[in-house]
From Swiss-Prot:
Protein name: Elongation factor Ts
Cross-referenced InterPro entries: EF-Ts_dimer_sf (IPR036402), Transl_elong_EFTs/EF1B (IPR001816), Transl_elong_EFTs/EF1B_dimer (IPR014039), Transl_elong_Ts_CS (IPR018101), UBA-like_sf (IPR009060)
Gene3D superfamilies: 1.10.286.20, DNA helicase RuvA subunit, C-terminal domain, Elongation factor Ts, dimerisation domain
Function, as annotated: Associates with the EF-Tu.GDP complex and induces the exchange of GDP to GTP. It remains bound to the aminoacyl-tRNA.EF-Tu.GTP complex up to the GTP hydrolysis stage on the ribosome.
Length: 287
């Protein structure tokens, strides 16, 4: 049996895209024979799944489950929206959500580990990368959730009130995507950034104006920014005549927290250059 050196593990990892520990195990099983290790990994479908792991998965689905006092919000990504609509993917998401809820998981790491075999099987079958990206669990007196087309999900925790109110506020969160619960959470740095952006965008309008007028303009913009960014100060989407905070207060409730997920949020999607791809294929064919 050949010695399982770090260099050998590194070579197998570079050739297959698999993780270090998986490569080490494969080499140990193959008696240090790297070619046999690769064949074994190919036969198990591991390499196919590992290679797909490098592909950007920015589509997918948001899933949520709640029992009125707790909820789990989950995002699972796929490479294409087409796969996200298929039963195999939907079943994977549903099973992952059920496991996370039943085990009261508070983050994605243990779920990713326990669902890895199922994920690899799905990747091998569908030919796309699939990732469990993130998970949040919340608990409280009253918990409501809203899911919009499996692409946007929101969860709201209330102290007082009822599930229907929490669900309606979650619907508002899904529609408005507030940044903060209330204006007291907005940092001085965020306000300063907003002020600087306002000054840059309105340089021509404020040029030559008295300092007190400029200050009033800035204060007006900051007040508007706080109202737009804060959940409690936003106009309720189902009744713009009332603010969300006032809605909760009238119902004898207090909004404790909210969580918002949108599929692919923050993931940089690759831009396909079809012309360049065709040109590359033509050039390769001429060689």
């Amino acid at each position: 049996m050949a010695a399982i050196t770090a260099a050998l593990v590194k070579e197998l990892r570079e050739r297959t895209g698999e993780g270090m520990m998986d490569c080490k195990k494969a080499l140990e099983k193959a008696g240090g024979d790297i070619e046999k290790a690769i064949d074994d990994m190919r036969a198990s479908g591991a390499i196919k799944a590992a290679k797909k792991a490098g592909n950007v998965a920015a589509e997918g689905a948001i899933a949520v489950k709640t029992d009125g006092t707790s909820a789990v919000l989950l995002e699972v990504n796929s490479q294409t929206d087409f796969l996200a609509l298929q039963d195999d993917f939907k079943n994977f998401v549903a099973e992952s959500l059920e496991e996370a809820f039943a085990q009261k998981l508070t983050d994605a790491a243990p779920l990713i580990a326990s669902r890895e075999a199922a994920r690899e099987a799905l990747v091998a079958k569908c030919g796309e990368n699939v990732n469990i990206r993130r998970l949040v669990r919340v608990e409280g007196d009253v918990v409501g959730a809203y899911l919009h087309g499996n692409k946007i999900g929101a969860v709201v925790v209330l102290k007082g009130g009822d599930v229907e109110l929490a669900k309606n506020i979650a619907m508002h969160v899904a529609a408005s995507n507030p940044e903060f619960l209330d204006s007291s959470e907005i940092s001085a740095e965020a306000i300063e950034r907003e002020k600087n952006v306002f000054l840059q965008l309105n340089a021509d309008k404020i040029a030559g104006k008295p300092e007190n007028i400029v200050e009033n303009m800035i204060n007006g913009r900051i007040t508007k920014f706080k109202a737009e960014a804060s959940l409690k100060e936003q106009a309720f989407v189902m009744n713009p005549e009332i603010k969300v905070g006032e809605l909760a207060k009238k119902a004898g409730a207090e909004i404790v927290s909210f969580t918002y997920f949108k599929v692919g949020e923050g993931i940089e999607k690759p831009v396909d250059d079809f012309a360049a791809e065709v040109a590359a294929q033509v050039a390769a064919a001429k060689q």
